[in-house]
Amino acid sequence: DFASCHTNGGICLPNRCPGHMIQIGICFRPRVKCCRSW
């Protein structure tokens, strides 16, 4: 969720993570990804 995403150093982004980031989870709905830099 949103809180655990931020705890892990990620940010919530719609649809998918950009090329320089990796997905570490989801935020609100499955379409909203939790992304983090490499």
Swiss-Prot record:
Entry superkingdom: Eukaryota
Gene Ontology CC: extracellular space; membrane; microvesicle; sperm midpiece
Keyword line: Antibiotic, Antimicrobial, Defensin, Disulfide bond, Membrane, Secreted
GO biological process: calcium-mediated signaling; cell chemotaxis; defense response to bacterium; defense response to Gram-negative bacterium; defense response to Gram-positive bacterium; positive regulation of flagellated sperm motility involved in capacitation
Subcellular location: Secreted; Membrane
GO terms of molecular function: CCR6 chemokine receptor binding; chemoattractant activity; identical protein binding
Organ and tissue specificity: Neutrophilic granules.
Record-annotated disulphide pairs: 5-34, 12-27, 17-35
Pfam families cross-referenced by the UniProt entry: Defensin_beta (PF00711)
Record-stated family: Belongs to the beta-defensin family.
Function comment: Has bactericidal activity. Active against E.coli ML35 but not against S.aureus 502A. May act as a ligand for C-C chemokine receptor CCR6. Positively regulates the sperm motility and bactericidal activity in a CCR6-dependent manner. Binds to CCR6 and triggers Ca2+ mobilization in the sperm which is important for its motility.
Self-association state and partner proteins as the record states: Monomer. Homodimer.
Protein name: Beta-defensin 1
